[in-house]
Amino acid sequence: LKRVLIYYMVKDLLTPDYIFESSWEVCNKVGGIYTVLSTRANTLQEKFRDRIFFIGPDVWQGKENPLFIESDNLCAAWKKHALEKDELSVRIGRWNIPGEPIVILVDFQPFFEKKDDIYTEMWNSYQVDSLHAYGDYDEASMFSYAAGRVVESFYPYTLTETDKVVYQPN
């Protein structure tokens, strides 16, 4: 029975066609998560060659970031669509680590002016209480919201309904 269960469990495992992973530490080396992400990025890039996208905050705006290699060609049509239709300002390129996976850096600052509406929506839909938040809650929340919006914009523009997609926020 154990072999049968294992067979069916493995048989039903799905491999995603695309992976999106977001973290404050994508192209932004500030702590331990950076090491975890950058170490496994090479392995994931080998398996999913340019079908894994890391999403990070564009905290280096206007400054040279040695961890980010910007590209004008990667996802250029979607980048234009994201700005014009979804009001998302992104920079796209490669993470300067082994494997050089595709990176989307998003400017999350514009969402601060919509913060109260976003928090209201989160409370009404999911009962996420932001009233008692402290520390860097707002900054982390606005980045998380922006990263989710990136995937929400990218998916229908670039992928198909039959594509299996995983979104892993950190």
Model-predicted regions and their roles:
Residues 6-170:
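Catalytic cores of nucleotide-sugar-dependent glycosyltransferases that transfer UDP/GDP/TDP-activated
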